[in-house]
């Protein structure tokens, strides 16, 4: 009997040890949910985590982005060409009209994600046209990728034989997120599980089952969206949609005890745009100076004031540029410190 009892005790001790290890692992596991409207920069933050906290992109992985980059570049110039008609803008050189027609035809016939020389030559000629540049300046009046100017002004490099996308090229590439993408990494003794959820309206119903046991929500809102409308509804201002979404998340009963961090993203695009387009486009009551600091702060306050439990729940906010690795590294470091502090508070150690 003694031998049986000691075997049981041993088994019990092993089980206890395993449960303790599992509990410790759970305590060190951080479930991060990235939420925000479409095209706010969520997937770019995920790419940065791969660069900062994993091993970055291998040569093979970088090469896989070529087709996406060429696709993004072509879609961008086509969007500008179409907008030339809708906005009734004339080409600086009438010969570009033929180029535009040729491009439209080629776009339908080439293999997706390729960039034949004839096509890249046409795109480069179009991009230099004064009419196209005037149309590009009015990008908030139609749907255009943020990366349009970045790729189009550097197309010569992108079509050089043997081209390998740089980290920045990869960060700027855009693929609509459908479904949920999980990324795992370790940092400061914590195991992170980060979930990127599609932001377009049709994708949001998939969020609900991610809510269980979330440690922290990073809500991403594009500062530069204040003069833009939704891809899926051209009657709705993107900033208003983002505020509406933030309101429903920060006051949701599911998240009463969840840390929430607000990333006011695309500060680089915003700082350029605010020089030309007044914030009152989005907030008619705003009559402050139309500067990066004042307008940016006003937007931040609009978000933070939606928090109905301000007395007991603090929402931390950061101005971010998701394509700037150093900025994201710095901000994510601060977010991790908040998570550690909140965790210690929950354990009664803080």
From Swiss-Prot:
Protein keywords: Cell projection, GTP-binding, Lipoprotein, Magnesium, Membrane, Metal-binding, Myristate, Nucleotide-binding, Phosphoprotein, Sensory transduction, Transducer, Vision
GO BP annotation list: adenylate cyclase-modulating G protein-coupled receptor signaling pathway; background adaptation; cell population proliferation; cellular response to electrical stimulus; detection of light stimulus involved in visual perception; dopamine secretion; eye photoreceptor cell development; neural tissue regeneration
Region described as G5 motif: spans on this chain: 320-325
Chain spans, region Disordered: 1-21
Top-level taxon in the UniProt lineage: Eukaryota
Residue segments, region Interaction with RHO: 340-350
Gene Ontology CC: one annotated term: membrane
Cellular compartment(s): Cell projection, Cilium, Photoreceptor outer segment; Membrane; Photoreceptor inner segment
Residue ranges of the region described as G3 motif: 192-201
Disulfide bond annotation, renumbered to this chain: none
Residues making up the signal peptide according to the UniProt record: none
Lipidation residue positions, type N-myristoyl glycine: 2
Region (G1 motif): 31-44
Basic and acidic residues: bias regions: 7-21
Tissue specificity statement from the Swiss-Prot or TrEMBL entry: Rod.
Principal location: other
Region annotated G4 motif, chain positions: 261-268
Region (G2 motif), start-end ranges: 169-177
The protein's assembly and partners: Heterotrimeric G proteins are composed of 3 subunits alpha, beta and gamma. The alpha chain contains the guanine nucleotide binding site. Interacts with RHO. Interacts with RGS9 and PDE6G. Interacts (when myristoylated) with UNC119; interaction is required for localization in sensory neurons.
Family of this protein: Belongs to the G-alpha family. G(i/o/t/z) subfamily.
Official protein name in the record: Guanine nucleotide-binding protein G(t) subunit alpha-1
Natural source organism: Canis lupus familiaris
């Amino acid at each position: 009997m003694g031998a049986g009892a000691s075997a049981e005790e041993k088994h019990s001790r092993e089980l206890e040890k395993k449960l303790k290890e599992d509990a410790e692992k759970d305590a060190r596991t951080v479930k991060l949910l990235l939420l925000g409207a479409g095209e706010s920069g969520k997937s770019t933050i995920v790419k940065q985590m791969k660069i900062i906290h994993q091993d970055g992109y291998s040569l093979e992985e970088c090469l896989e982005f070529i087709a996406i980059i060429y696709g993004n570049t072509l879609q961008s110039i086509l969007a500008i060409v179409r907008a030339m008609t809708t906005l009734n803008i004339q080409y600086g050189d009438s010969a570009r009209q033929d180029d535009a027609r040729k491009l439209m035809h080629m776009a339908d016939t080439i293999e997706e994600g390729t960039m034949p020389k004839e096509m890249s030559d046409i795109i480069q000629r179009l991009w230099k046209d004064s009419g196209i540049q005037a149309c590009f300046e009015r990008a908030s009046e139609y749907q255009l990728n943020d990366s349009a100017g970045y790729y189009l002004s550097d197309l010569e490099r992108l079509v050089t034989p043997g081209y390998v996308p740089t980290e920045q090229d990869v960060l700027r590439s855009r693929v609509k997120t459908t479904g949920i993408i999980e990324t795992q990494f370790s940092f400061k003794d914590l195991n992170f599980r980060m979930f990127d959820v599609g932001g377009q309206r049709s994708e949001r119903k998939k969020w609900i089952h991610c809510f269980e046991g979330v440690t922290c929500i990073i809500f991403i809102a594009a500062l530069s969206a204040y003069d833009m409308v939704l891809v899926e509804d051209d009657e709705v201002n993107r900033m208003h949609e983002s505020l509406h979404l933030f309101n429903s998340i920060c006051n949701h009963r599911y998240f009463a005890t969840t840390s929430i961090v607000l990333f006011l993203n695309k500060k680089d695009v915003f700082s350029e745009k605010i020089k030309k387009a007044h914030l009152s486009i989005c907030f008619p009551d705003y009559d402050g100076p139309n500067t990066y600091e004042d307008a940016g702060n006003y937007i931040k306050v609009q978000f933070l004031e939606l928090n109905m439990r301000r007395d007991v729940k603090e929402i931390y906010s950061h101005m971010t540029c998701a394509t700037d690795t150093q900025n994201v590294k710095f901000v994510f470091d601060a977010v991790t410190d908040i998570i550690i502090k909140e965790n210690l508070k929950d354990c009664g150690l803080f």
